[in-house]
């Protein structure tokens, strides 16, 4: 009888641990929309090194921070900024934020996160925004 109770308790504990881990690490996919560019950032950098857009076309950047608030460098926040277009969006820990802008001049521009991880000088915390016209 004790063996059955022990087995049942073990199964419940393992099941609850699995549920906890699933909730802690599962990140549902973001919905897709027209002219919305999804960018994810974590302590390892951005998931996109280069983004192509068209001049004169309104674009929305949806930035998602994959880091939690327990990170000591930046507190889990991440930024996506392009100085030339005055774009600056900051996503909270494990959250999203959006910025909409219309690039007016063709060229290649730097986007960056200057909140953590060595800031914009870290090669993984910046990338290229290519505006084609």
Explain the meaning of each model-derived region.
Residues 58, 77-79, 108:
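Exposed beta-strand and adjacent loop surfaces of beta-rich binding modules
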Residues 43, 57, 65-67, 84-86, ...:
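A mature extracytoplasmic/lumenal domain signature
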Residues 3-31, 91-133:
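Extracellular/periplasmic metallocenter environments
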Residues 45-49, 83-86, 96-98:
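Short structured motifs
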Residues 29-59:
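N-terminal edge beta-strand
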Residues 37-39, 51, 87-89, 99-101, ...:
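Generic detection of short hydrophobic beta-strand segments and adjacent strand-loop junctions
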Residues 66-93, 119-123:
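Histidine- and aromatic-enriched segments that form or immediately flank copper-ligand environments
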